[in-house]
Amino acid sequence: MAPRDSAEPLPPLSPQAWAWSGKFLAMGALAGFSVLSLLTYGYLCWGQDLEEEGSLKAQVDERPEAGTAGTSQPHLIFILADDQGFRDVGYHGSEIKTPTLDKLAAEGVKLENYYVQPICTPSRSQFITGKYQIHTGLQHSIIRPTQPNCLPLDNATLPQKLKEVGYSTHMVGKWHLGFYRKDCMPTKRGFDTFFGSLLGSGDYYTHYKCDSPGVCGYDLYENDNAAWDYDNGIYSTQMYTQRVQQILATHDPTKPLFLYVAYQAVHSPLQAPGRYFEHYRSIININRRRYAAMLSCLDEAIHNVTLALKRYGFYNNSIIIYSSDNGGQPTAGGSNWPLRGSKGTYWEGGIRAVGFVHSPLLKNKGTVCKELVHITDWYPTLISLAEGQIDEDIQLDGYDIWETISEGLRSPRVDILHNIDPIYTKAKNGSWAAGYGIWNTAIQSAIRVQHWKLLTGNPGYSDWVPPQAFSNLGPNRWHNERITLSTGKSIWLFNITADPYERVDLSSRYPGIVKKLLRRLSQFNKTAVPVRYPPKDPRSNPRLNGGVWGPWYKEENKKKKSNKTKAKKMQKKKSKARMRKQLAAHSSIKCHPSVATG
């Protein structure tokens, strides 16, 4: 499905600029490549030890797959990791061991030009609606636990569309798309079953979350009710995997299945079972060590999900998609090296994600896709694979990219609106003048058109954070890799193809390109809906809801309130009518001539 309008073609970077950028990149990134090569060697050595020790034990028996005849529609398995950094996978050179992810990706299609959003709610909303944030009103930040806000109810969700063509739809894991009303819950947005958390984070064992002092509650749900039976200290990654196995064990593989598994890992708080620390004692940075253990547990979980797909007869007709929801957070153990920036920013480190597709149904297995892909593309792609229909009047921002992935064809996508956030205007020096009268550069925005990427406003923390496993590089950053944003700057231009690490700002060199991208931003902004970011509601406090985070907005209260309002209006009308009668009565009395009237 095409976006609302097409982008203007932009000229390529000149050969001289390519050469100039290449020299700059070579000097700045050489050390990074040597580090990556060392880590790759260490990972390969560890992989041999892993096979010998058998430390990743399956929780289900590996046995030949049963027949799966009976449906031409594939089973769709979407696995979403939380806060996994771009570098935090073995095949990107990480020191963290991810043999399952490496194997699945190597046998499938690696997505090496794949983009998501910089934080949780936006990525999840775009996956489930196929629309940019500016078209759902979720442009600003995330949905907070105490906000009366959720994914707009007038947006048809992916599971709703899949149910129309006969799919059973199940969600396991983190929702984070709002819950203040019952209509906002996953089971009301297209999922037959839901087992997971409603908030953005929480304790992995107790499943409790405090949003602020005194505002704490339990956050684990079975469909529409608190899952108190699981208040027993089970680590969420393992608990969610067990639920996935149960779903697969009880579902008929001849009937199409959509399974959305949104793991809590590797989001903070940094917690993991003790045995996963075994191979990471040498990592000095404690947050990195804990993060590594969490990621190893996640890798094992996906291993067990894959085995269950095979055991219960789903695998041969399944399409498995793996994605992170945003970049890693270096202060919480994640790494996006050698990309610039982190989670919460519009630099490449915040929005370029780990992603791959694994399936026996792929035509080009064992390949790398470098075509432009965005998280909104999964919506039309999966509906098309499911033999579903998208209404012509629904304007999506995603494209069907299955042929791009499976057959290696060119991507239909030429641009990505990373976001326009009119509320976030922290760039003190931004102005209309800086945007050539086309755009107010105080506004945080980012757009990609072909090779070019433009950022305005304050894009967020902009450092390159090196691998934290190496203590000699310093506790926080490698000083040679740090660049401080220029004072007064509110606009940047990069050629991402030539300069994927965003080291060479070309905004002053190519003002014509800047103007074209600013016009494109302006075009997108004309289609934006108002931002939905309401103030917190004190009724959301779990203490008022049995100690549980959950829907607090009661429809019956609304009716009572409306009835009271009507009664008050009637009283006012009666009162006004009485006053009018009294005034009329007084006006009919004639004044005595000797009585002064003025």
Curated annotation (Swiss-Prot):
Its EC number is 3.1.6.-. Residues 559-583 have a biased composition (Basic residues). The modification 3-oxoalanine (Cys) is found at C120. Its main location: secreted. InterPro entries: Alkaline_phosphatase_core_sf (IPR017850), ARSB (IPR047115), Sulfatase_CS (IPR024607), Sulfatase_N (IPR000917). It is an enzyme of class 3 (hydrolase). Residues 532-598 are annotated as: Disordered. This is Arylsulfatase J. Glycans are attached at N155, N304, N316, N429, N495, N525, N563. Residues 1-47 form the signal peptide. Binds 1 Ca(2+) ion per subunit. It is found in: Secreted. GO terms for molecular function: metal ion binding; sulfuric ester hydrolase activity. Ca(2+) binds at D82, D83, C120, D325, N326. The active site is at C120, H176. The conversion to 3-oxoalanine (also known as C-formylglycine, FGly), of a serine or cysteine residue in prokaryotes and of a cysteine residue in eukaryotes, is critical for catalytic activity. Its cofactor is Ca(2+). One of its GO terms (cellular component) is extracellular region. Transmembrane segments: none annotated. Belongs to the sulfatase family. Substrate binds at K174, H267, K343.
